[in-house]
Curated annotation (Swiss-Prot):
Keywords: Chloroplast, Membrane, NAD, NADP, Plastid, Plastoquinone, Quinone, Thylakoid, Translocase, Transmembrane, Transmembrane helix, Transport. NDH shuttles electrons from NAD(P)H:plastoquinone, via FMN and iron-sulfur (Fe-S) centers, to quinones in the photosynthetic chain and possibly in a chloroplast respiratory chain. The immediate electron acceptor for the enzyme in this species is believed to be plastoquinone. Couples the redox reaction to proton translocation, and thus conserves the redox energy in a proton gradient. The gene is ndhF. This is NAD(P)H-quinone oxidoreductase subunit 5, chloroplastic. GO terms for biological process: ATP synthesis coupled electron transport; electron transport coupled proton transport. It is an enzyme of class 7 (translocase). It comes from Zygnema circumcarinatum (Green alga).
């Protein structure tokens, strides 16, 4: 029986062909009929379902064989330049294949319900299929050249999907911001690839690290140059995985449809940066300074994302900053050498965050008939509350995702996050402390989102009613959701409202939510400690490991030691959730002058401190404002100066030359009298001037 690995190239090909077919259909048909829309969904979901089954087969063969497979084809061979393309199948790529396809299938099913009334329904499925093909091609790439090609395709798909509703100015701005910010990282990645090839003469993942090690041992390579090369390579993951300081594009990318937020900006594309760091980890470990840079970048990003998420009012943007923080956890783990923990958290977080994003989409879809289709209202948690009674499936599944992300046992993210904390404490205690504090912040802001959205009373109807009667409650000027609750607590009865009630989403949207709860609950057990008597610490550690690298592992003496190790992370998570319940629980209507809000009457150092933290979080740590006042302002000023120079200098010279030519032509036109005698007279005058010039040149010996 032939190995399935020989046909692994079919995996990215199927969704690619689907995208081509749908694209040709869009070109040939202006307005898709109902049957064509349904056909595009069936084709996209069916192709990706087959791809998912193939990916699961590849993963199973990797598990039982425990051997990598590589298939290469010569692409370019010119003198000393020899490049190949092909497929690389190992435990890392096999896991990513299953991750992308399983989440992708559920997102496409969800999309059928979420985008059912959108005019761009077929176009959306075409973009989804193209992105899936690009992502699958990226994880199967055996070298950096092929990675870069698919890396750019993934970025292009993100641009198209973030700006899917391009007639909306905010969406058009968001896709440009995402594209330009990622170009900074991609340029660094390209320079790093070129420098690495110049140093090692190869771009194959399994060769560059060994050659770099050999060059360092033989003192044939400059350590500084190799460090710069690795840092340039790391710029690509910094931008793609929304790490500080190139993270600013991710929250704005929430302008795209919610299924995209779940697939691209939570589970797959943003994880591509983590994947590339994992691939390059043997190379990075040759330079300890680079590992420290990676670790500190992840640690700072984790804390920054968590603090900024504390006061966000937009549900999707709050989840975006949460994603940024969790990606920081993964980068931190890889930076301290914990290869398994970083990738383990990538897996658990992908399913949990996909569940949360799809749940947020269900919430938005359910309240839009009540509050309107403006995202400033339908995504604003201020307009929500009490939705668990109207949307029970969405509420329960969102709570499961929240429990997982907060690290509550036995949900998936508990196992991976706890392993990261333990390894960080062991290698860099300062970063371990930051990661531990981030765990508490994560529990606080996630339960804050849950309580504001699903508990209490629904506030949307009363707000819309007050707006329609010109008694507008300005959300932008509200100090917090508490002030909003205090002002609307006497007018939140849905029965008296003339508006529709929030409603649960269709089966096409709720079934993926229910299915995603299964891995959110169970998949963490693949990394759970094994009972005494078995070697190793988990099932995952027997299979997903990195050769020739220092992996931080703690001794495993059973569940007792594990429970003691996990106690600090669970404790601070419970503390964060408890504080969120006190501040944002169902009883918030009874609270007055809550110090967490921006209360003008707040006095003392406590009020000043809390208000400063609130402003820091609400205004995104002022980073976007700083960038606008520096890089954006400088770029626009330079562009305006160049435009002025082009208009008045470059164009001015050309225009003046044209003006003189015009005047000369007009003047010459009047000498055209048609008389031969006049022409002879002018010719004679010219000859006289020529003779005078010749005499002068001869006399003065010029």
């Amino acid at each position: 029986m032939q190995s399935i690995n020989q046909y692994v190239w079919i995996i990215p090909l199927l969704p690619c062909l689907t995208a081509v077919i749908l694209g040709l259909g869009l070109i040939s048909t202006k307005n898709a009929t109902k049957s064509q829309r349904l056909g595009s969904a069936i084709l996209s979901i069916g192709a990706l379902l087959v791809t998912m089954l193939l990916s699961i087969t590849v993963l199973w063969e990797q598990v039982i064989s425990d051997s990598a497979y590589r298939q290469l084809v010569s692409w370019i061979k010119v003198d000393n330049l020899f490049l190949e393309i092909g497929c690389l199948v190992d435990p890392l790529s096999a896991i990513m294949l299953v991750l992308v396809t399983t989440v992708g299938v559920l997102v496409m099913i969800y999309t059928h319900g979420y985008m059912s009334h959108d005019q761009g329904y077929v176009r959306f499925f075409a973009y989804l299929s193209l992105f899936t093909a690009s992502m699958l091609g990226l994880v199967l790439s055996p070298n950096l050249v092929q990675v870069y090609a698919f890396w750019e395709l993934v970025g292009m798909c993100s641009y198209l999907l973030v700006g899917f509703w391009f007639t909306r100015p905010s969406a058009a701005y968001a896709c440009q911001k995402a594209f330009i910010t990622n170009r900074v990282g991609d340029f660094g990645l390209l320079l790093g690839i070129l420098a690495l090839y110049w140093l090692t003469g190869s771009l194959e993942f399994d060769i560059v690290a060994s050659r770099a090690h050999q060059l360092l041992v033989e003192n044939s390579a400059n350590t500084v140059l190799l460090t710069v090369c690795c840092v340039l390579l790391f710029l690509g993951p910094i931008a793609k995985s929304a790490q500080f300081p190139l993270h600013v594009w991710l929250p704005d990318a929430m302008e795209g449809p919610t299924p995209i937020s779940a697939l691209i900006h939570a589970a797959t594309m943003v994880a591509a940066g983590v994947y590339l760091v994992a691939r390059l980890l043997p190379l990075f470990q040759e330079v300890p300074l680079v590992m420290d840079i990676v670790a500190w970048t992840g640690g700072i990003t984790a804390v920054l994302g968590a603090t900024v998420a504390l006061a966000q009012k937009d549900l999707k943007k709050g989840l975006a900053y949460s994603t940024m923080s969790q990606l920081g956890y993964m980068i931190l783990a890889l930076g301290v050498g914990s290869y398994q923990a970083g990738l383990f958290h990538l897996i658990t977080h992908a399913y949990s965050k996909a569940l949360l994003f799809l749940g947020s989409g269900s919430v938005i879809h359910g309240i839009e008939p009540v509050v309107g289709y403006n995202p400033n209202q339908s995504q604003n948690m201020t307009y929500m509350g009490g939705l668990r009674s109207y949307m029970p499936i969405t509420g329960v599944t969102f709570l499961i995702g929240t429990l997982s992300l907060c690290g509550v046992p036995p949900f998936a993210c508990f196992w991976s996050k706890d392993e990261i904390l333990a390894d960080a404490w062991h290698k860099l205690p300062v970063l371990g402390l930051l990661a531990w504090l981030t765990a508490g912040l994560t529990a606080f802001y996630m339960f804050r989102m849950y309580f504001i959205t699903f508990e209490g009373t629904f506030r949307g109807s009363s707000l819309i009613s007050n707006k329609s009667s010109k008694q507008t409650l300005s959300v932008n000027k509200m100090d917090s959701v508490f002030a909003l609750s205090n002002q609307t607590k006497d007018n939140t009865s849905l029965k008296a409202s003339k508006h529709l009630d929030p409603h649960e989403s269709s089966n096409a949207m709720t079934i993926p939510l229910i299915v995603l709860t299964i891995p959110t609950i169970l998949i963490g057990f693949i990394g759970a400690p094994l009972p005494n008597g078995l070697t190793g610490s988990s099932l995952l550690s027997h299979w997903l490991y990195l050769d020739n690298t220092e992996i931080v592992e703690l001794s495993t003496n059973g569940w007792t030691e594990f429970a003691i190790t996990a106690l600090p992370s669970v404790s601070i998570g419970i503390l964060g959730a408890f504080i969120a319940w006190i501040v944002y629980g169902p009883h918030v209507d009874r609270l007055k002058n809550n110090p967490v809000s921006i209360d003008p009457s707040a006095e003392g150092w406590t009020g000043i401190l809390l208000n400063s933290i609130y402003n820091w979080s609400l205004r995104r740590a002022y980073i976007d404002e700083i960038y606008d006042q520096t890089f954006v302002w400088a770029t626009r000023s330079s562009a305006n100066a160049l435009a002025w120079f082009d208009q008045w200098t470059i164009d001015g010279i050309v225009n003046v030359g044209g003006l003189f030519t015009l005047l000369g032509g007009e003047g010459t036109r009047y000498t055209e009298s048609g008389r031969t005698s006049a022409y002879i007279f002018v010719l004679g005058i010219g000859l006289v001037f020529v003779m005078i010039a010749a005499v002068l040149f001869n006399f003065f010996h010029l």
